């Protein structure tokens, strides 16, 4: 048997083995658990001198998927709570009714996203026996709250007064599409490590998510 024929046969055997490996996954269920780094432009409209914006947070993620085709799976997931905040701080002093006063304090506005849910599809394609790349798309179901909190101190005529409090000034919920891509590296026969990036929209604000999760087949 010449060298070229050996190479062809070896290639066919590898392809058959790969097809068999994929076929055994059809009809299986998998679970994922991980963390997602979230960044949003929800509060960028408040950007100005003296305003500090924190637009990143970390949320836990959980998901379940069903492989109904060699490449396609149906997925449902949960993304934990996250928030972005903008803090406006300052101080002022002067006189009122002939008596001195000074004010120092901070106002914080938060865009708080409660637990969100995803429903979508994932298309996977093998690169080699251990690595898959995939794309995903679906709907994100979200619930957003706007909170404002104030912490301040007033000193008037030598007496100091402190006030603080938090109030909700906005609430909305809805659903918007998401899409993303990623890669899955097989650690063993049942466990993989998924790394992906998704693009979402929450209440007209753009949200980016970079997640790392453990994927376990059953």
Predicted regions and their residues:
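Hydrophobic, lipid-facing positions within transmembrane beta-strands of outer-membrane proteins
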Residues: 29, 58-62, 115-119, 177-181, ...
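Transmembrane beta-barrel strands of outer-membrane/channel proteins
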Residues: 31-37, 76-80, 135-139, 195-199
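Residues on the lipid-exposed face of transmembrane beta-strands in outer-membrane beta-barrel proteins
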Residues: 62-66, 119-123, 137-139, 181-185, ...
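Solvent-exposed loop/turn segments connecting transmembrane beta-strands
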Residues: 127, 173-175, 200-209
């Amino acid at each position: 048997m010449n060298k070229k024929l050996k190479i062809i046969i070896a290639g066919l055997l590898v392809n058959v083995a790969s097809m068999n490996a994929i076929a055994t996954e059809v009809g299986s269920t998998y679970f994922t658990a991980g963390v997602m780094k979230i960044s949003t432009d929800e509060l960028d409209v408040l950007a100005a001198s003296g305003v500090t914006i924190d637009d990143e947070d970390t949320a836990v993620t959980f998901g379940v998927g069903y492989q109904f085709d060699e490449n396609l799976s149906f997925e449902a997931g949960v993304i934990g709570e996250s928030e972005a905040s903008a803090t406006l701080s300052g101080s002022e002093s002067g006189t009122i009714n002939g008596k001195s006063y000074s004010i120092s304090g901070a106002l914080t506005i938060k865009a708080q996203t409660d637990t969100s849910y995803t429903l979508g599809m994932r298309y996977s394609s093998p690169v080699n026996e251990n690595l898959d790349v995939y794309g995903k798309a679906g709907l994100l179901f979200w619930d957003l709250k706007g909170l404002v909190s104030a912490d301040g101190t007033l000193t008037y005529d030598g007496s100091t007064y402190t006030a603080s409090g938090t109030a909700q000034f906005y609430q909305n919920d809805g659903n918007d599409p998401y899409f993303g891509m990623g890669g899955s590296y097989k650690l063993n026969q049942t466990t993989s490590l998924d790394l992906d990036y998704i693009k979402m929209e929450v209440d007209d604000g753009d949200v980016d998510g970079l997640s790392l999760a453990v994927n376990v087949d059953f």
